[in-house]
Amino acid sequence: MNQPLPKDIINVKAGDKLAAEWHHTLDSTPETDKSDPIDPGHLGPIMVYLAKVDSALTTTVTGLKWFKIYEDGMDSNGTWAVTRLYNNKGKVEFTLPKCIQNGQ
């Protein structure tokens, strides 16, 4: 876990479109690390899960009830989601379900 923990919270609404970004380290980039955000030979799906917490600054995940809100796999051209993540320099966009509460 990176220290210190962040102190900022971003409020989001059900139905909002969000983007997540993956990298090997906080300062790695595809220009400095050819395997960033992930080795291009690592093929597979991408999934996003959420869990309800009292605060987005919660530091433990013990006992949380996780649920999947996004999954991307292999497309009709045979390209895996991780390949699209690699080609998009570590970024993936997804939409929060409209049926959940607004949150952080």
Regions found by a protein language model. Give the residues of each.
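Structured recognition/catalytic domains enriched at protein termini
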Residues: 1-103
